[in-house]
Amino acid sequence: DAFQAKVLGAVSAAQHVHLLAEHYGICAVLHTDHANRKLVPWIDALVDHSEEYYKENGKALYSSHMLDLSEEDIDDNLNECARMLERMAKLDMSLEIELGITGGEEDGVGHDIEEGADSSHLYTQPEDVLKAYDLLTPIGHFSVAASFGNVHGVYKPGNVQLRPEILKNSQELVSKTHGTAEKPLNLVFHGGSGSEKDKIAAAISYGVFKMNIDTDTQFAFAEGVGKYVEEHMTAFKYQIDPETGAPLKKYYDPRKWLRQGELSFIKRLDEAFEDLGSAGRSLAK
């Protein structure tokens, strides 16, 4: 059935990554993004598989999962996150939660961004972050996808204003309340695509350790494929060149044009590594 297919697809993908990571001696972090209420059973099923994998390998299939219940009441959101983290913490896994709504659309799920609309719901309240910290810290490791005007996708400039200082305010409130170190929270920057470099730098300085750039990487992949298709348009209309009679298989072979997408994708990742200060660094070293 469709549900089982989604579970097995995620499990087999993780197993493939673990196999290659071990072969090449690299550190691979596997994470599932934005699971709303209807996808909670899918996450539970993946944790089931991680429990079995952990028994044999001493590690979980996935490093972390995300629950995005930001549209729900804060207590309902956090209580479900606490339940899930109880399971995951036993496997040394981390849970990512979302507080405040990140606008735009991510894989068909999102919130409309309209010019002139009230965007107050796009900003996380530090008090909610403190509430999450109080409930989840005793259970296990978690990170917070806090909303500070960031949106999924790329939108017309001016529709939403990034306010990374909200991240600083959350860090300061938790630190002051509990007497912790300067930045006790692990924060995630969703909707990083198209963001200004100075805003990215500010977010990192306030404790962001992960930034999502799905839209930019999708575009980079499509751009690489698109350029290749433009350069070899005849091969995408005919199997044999109508003028020369030469076979065109070596041009329309999917391995050729998909590789161009990969190379363009890699170039965008290299840019992100520089922006985030992670170029040349590895958790495995």
Q: Over which residues does each language-model region extend?
A:
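Alpha/beta enzyme core
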Residues: 1-3, 7-25, 36-183, 197-202, ...
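Catalytic-face loop-and-helix region of soluble metabolic enzyme cores
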Residues: 21-22, 151, 156, 166, ...
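Structural detector of well-ordered beta-strand residues that form the stable sheet scaffold
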Residues: 29-33, 95-96, 188
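Conserved acidic functional residues
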Residues: 33-35, 68, 190-192
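Exposed alpha-helical structural elements
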Residues: 128-131, 220, 224, 264
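Residues that form generic nucleotide/phosphate-binding pockets
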Residues: 135, 224, 228, 275
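Extended, intrinsically disordered, low-complexity segments
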Residues: 230-285
